[in-house]
Amino acid sequence: MDFGVQDIKNIIPHRYPFLLIDRVSYIEPGKKVVAYKNVTSNEYFFQGHFPEMPVMPGVLIIEALAQAGAVAILSQEEFKGKIAFFGAINKAKFRRNVVPGDTLKLEVEIIKIKGSAGIGKGTAYIGEKKAAEGELMFMIGDKN
């Protein structure tokens, strides 16, 4: 199953300039997702981080993982039409710089759901090498 940007926008509320995933190549609703972010030299954050040596901010890599995780959890039947709120990040590690031209592969596995709260383990890759990883805590709520 391959989701494009419009499909993603039908699941999560994020929009430009804060929608940080471009494509979903695999989804097991409520369990696992594989998504991608194509990092280009036109990204707004490169204007200030850093103009002479553009590097994607680590917090935005984590946010991209959180958005991918939100697609996984909000695709589960009982959570369709809801919104996922980022609760916490634990054990975050940044292993390599993400620069223009890179394609981030974002893998998130939902490891625990209890009621409307849960935890996902996210890993971002460039090729086969880890760029970042962490545990993402989230809450599911109503849009209104």
Curated annotation (Swiss-Prot):
EC number: 4.2.1.59
Subcellular location: Cytoplasm
Gene Ontology biological-process entries: fatty acid biosynthetic process; lipid A biosynthetic process
InterPro entries in UniProt: FabA_FabZ (IPR013114), FabZ (IPR010084), HotDog_dom_sf (IPR029069)
Active site: H49
Keywords, comma-separated and alphabetical: Cytoplasm, Lipid A biosynthesis, Lipid biosynthesis, Lipid metabolism, Lyase
UniProt xrefs under PANTHER family: 3-HYDROXYACYL-[ACYL-CARRIER-PROTEIN] DEHYDRATASE (PTHR30272:SF1)
Classification via NCBIfam families: fabZ, PRK00006.1
Role description: Involved in unsaturated fatty acids biosynthesis. Catalyzes the dehydration of short chain beta-hydroxyacyl-ACPs and long chain saturated and unsaturated beta-hydroxyacyl-ACPs.
Name of this protein: 3-hydroxyacyl-[acyl-carrier-protein] dehydratase FabZ
Source organism: Clostridium kluyveri (strain ATCC 8527 / DSM 555 / NBRC 12016 / NCIMB 10680 / K1)
